[in-house]
């Protein structure tokens, strides 16, 4: 997910995406603890996507 794609989305879409990404991260961490996670880079990628969304929201002045 690129920053330009995120900047085109509305604030509501970004907040929904943030909620979805955080749930995905929890799920990935659970899979890692159980030992079923095969792609260990997925956690890092998800964290970076969360950071990108938060950056765009903060640029808009949205407090979270």
Swiss-Prot record:
GO cellular component: cytosolic large ribosomal subunit
Molecular function as annotated in GO: structural constituent of ribosome
Primary gene name: rpmC
One Pfam entry name: Ribosomal_L29
A single GO BP: translation
Alphabetized UniProt keyword annotations: Ribonucleoprotein, Ribosomal protein
Organism name: Coprothermobacter proteolyticus (strain ATCC 35245 / DSM 5265 / OCM 4 / BT)
PANTHER family xref list: 60S RIBOSOMAL PROTEIN L35/50S RIBOSOMAL PROTEIN L29, LARGE RIBOSOMAL SUBUNIT PROTEIN UL29C
InterPro entries noted in UniProt: Ribosomal_protein_uL29 (IPR050063), Ribosomal_uL29 (IPR001854), Ribosomal_uL29_sf (IPR036049)
Transmembrane segment boundaries: none
Name of the protein this chain belongs to: Large ribosomal subunit protein uL29
Family stated for the protein in its record: Belongs to the universal ribosomal protein uL29 family.
């Amino acid at each position: 997910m690129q920053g330009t794609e995120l900047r085109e989305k509305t604030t509501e879409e970004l907040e929904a995406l943030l909620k979805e990404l955080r749930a995905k991260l929890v799920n990935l961490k659970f899979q890692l603890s159980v030992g079923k996670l095969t792609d260990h880079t997925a956690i890092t990628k998800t964290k970076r996507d969360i950071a990108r969304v938060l950056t765009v929201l903060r640029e808009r002045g949205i407090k979270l």
